[in-house]
Amino acid sequence: MSLAKRIIPCLDINGGRVVKGVNFIGLQDAGDPVEIARRYNDEGADEIVLLDITASYEQRGIMIEVVKNIAKEVFIPFSVGGGIRSLEDMSALLNAGCDKISINSAAIRNPQLIDESAKRFGSQCIVVAVDVKKVSQNSWNVYINGGRVDSGKDMLEWINEACARGAGEILLTSIDTDGTKGGYDKAMIEAVKSINVPIIASGGAGSMEDFADVFVHGADAALAASVFHYKEIEIKMLKTYLQDKGVPVRI
């Protein structure tokens, strides 16, 4: 049997609370991260991603506390990203109880950070998050600083470099489809099919069909936020739907 496809809810955290906005604008409080993470754990999520979207230094201590509290309540793997700039940041979060670290802008600015972190903590702990915008028919550029700045790097070149340096997984977000609920960018996922580490697709989930589609196009895992937060899609029902469609999932 092929490896089970993973369903991963994402929690955007701001000042210790889960928030949700469209394209980072108009943030609404969506609840307590520990309660929401526990709910996803109970509903059958395979993993959880926590994204510290403020990620300023004064908030860092709050995030450590959130991670400690979630680690006590949640028994599925969870990763933490947002504003992680050093091995010390990673060490503090892993010691607080998370399983994986997600790095994004810091990895573009200092690619050596991927090598160093993979060497110290193991590739299985290191997720490189890549936010992209389409620039032509089959070409995407990598954006940093919360999707605001074009790094000038080509998606495929950067993902290949990140994997060569030791990334254990790629979290690939289409900025174009993010928050639209019109489906994942399937051409983007198709373009990275040959990459030999797991690819988590992100940006655009609006229906159960969208999940089935992105798995057919080669994603190893699918991440979503608002459709799960607001219970538009229940994870148990989604997994039953996927199983009926012949997608291997862990029930």
UniProtKB/Swiss-Prot annotation:
Output the InterPro entries linked to this UniProt entry: Aldolase_TIM, His_biosynth, HisF, IGPS_HisA/HisF, RibuloseP-bd_barrel
Give the EC number(s) listed in the UniProt record. 4.3.2.10
Q: What is the lineage of its organism?
A: Bacteria, Pseudomonadati, Campylobacterota, Epsilonproteobacteria, Campylobacterales
A GO term, aspect molecular function: imidazoleglycerol-phosphate synthase activity
State the protein's purpose: IGPS catalyzes the conversion of PRFAR and glutamine to IGP, AICAR and glutamate. The HisF subunit catalyzes the cyclization activity that produces IGP and AICAR from PRFAR using the ammonia provided by the HisH subunit.
Q: What is this protein called?
A: Imidazole glycerol phosphate synthase subunit HisF
Q: Where is the active site?
A: D12, D131
Q: Which family does it belong to?
A: Belongs to the HisA/HisF family.
Is NAD one of the keywords? no
Q: Which UniProt keywords apply?
A: Amino-acid biosynthesis, Cytoplasm, Histidine biosynthesis, Lyase
* Gene Ontology process terms (BP): L-histidine biosynthetic process
**Where, subcellularly, is it found?**
Cytoplasm
Which domain of life does this protein belong to? Bacteria
User: What gene name is given for the protein in this entry?
Assistant: hisF
